[in-house]
């Protein structure tokens, strides 16, 4: 079934210029809808973990997400006295109290998650935004005004602090999703974008910005890397000298490995997850 779906999506992607809500084969519409429904239920995901820092990205699923915009017209979405006009409905629209209780998710108004995102049991959405294709795993808190971009992958027991931004893949078009692995703490107003991977048990301090071109300097080893924060790192914003010391440029600095003191200041509060 999965291989058949992939073949349909890949073929439709090659012919995407000819697709529209009124001009798409039923087979393509059904395949795209099936993928979105499976993403919404957490049965499919854009990327799957093979080990620490090791991920397989399923490009055909990302293509299905993009095709879904090609196959839908905008429609009126109402929420009380508010009105919206979009192609993607919200994730929890029309659910009863019993159905919401069964998800094990707490959603604080006016948090928004789009259909096609998955929010696992024990997760908390403060007034925040989770885009289509994103995966938020168990026990994670998405704090106030944080944004989980399209197809971003967030692990178990992660804390995304207020105003954190995780980049998406839809616009500008990115090859790989942004990934935050299990037990990470992302400090307020930090931005992780462009498919950067933050490996498990890491702590990103407040106001750190990391994209694929951001130097990540490890002061313990005096090395620079890009696109990946090693497991168990504590990262702050800083700069590195350039041009024979004439100027400096922004960098993310790994100042140490996570220790007991770090954990005590970034631990999750179980009282908030009852």
Swiss-Prot record:
Reactions listed under catalytic activity: (S)-2,3,4,5-tetrahydrodipicolinate + succinyl-CoA + H2O = (S)-2-succinylamino-6-oxoheptanedioate + CoA
GO molecular function, one term: 2,3,4,5-tetrahydropyridine-2,6-dicarboxylate N-succinyltransferase activity
UniProt binding sites for substrate: 106, 143
Top-level class of the enzyme under EC nomenclature: transferase
E.C. designation(s): 2.3.1.117
Listed InterPro entries: DapD_Trfase_Hexpep_rpt_fam (IPR005664), Hexapep (IPR001451), Hexapep_transf_CS (IPR018357), THP_succinylTrfase_dom1 (IPR023180), THP_succinylTrfase_N_sf (IPR037133), Trimer_LpxA-like_sf (IPR011004)
Domain of life: Bacteria
Keywords: Acyltransferase, Amino-acid biosynthesis, Cytoplasm, Diaminopimelate biosynthesis, Lysine biosynthesis, Repeat, Transferase
Pathway(s) of this molecule: Amino-acid biosynthesis; L-lysine biosynthesis via DAP pathway; LL-2,6-diaminopimelate from (S)-tetrahydrodipicolinate (succinylase route): step 1/3
Pfam (any one): Hexapep_2
GO terms (BP aspect): diaminopimelate biosynthetic process; lysine biosynthetic process via diaminopimelate
GO CC terms in record: cytoplasm
Main location: cytoplasm
Localization terms from the record: Cytoplasm
Record-stated family: Belongs to the transferase hexapeptide repeat family.
Subunit structure: Homotrimer.
Protein name, UniProt field: 2,3,4,5-tetrahydropyridine-2,6-dicarboxylate N-succinyltransferase
Organism the protein comes from: Paracidovorax citrulli (strain AAC00-1)
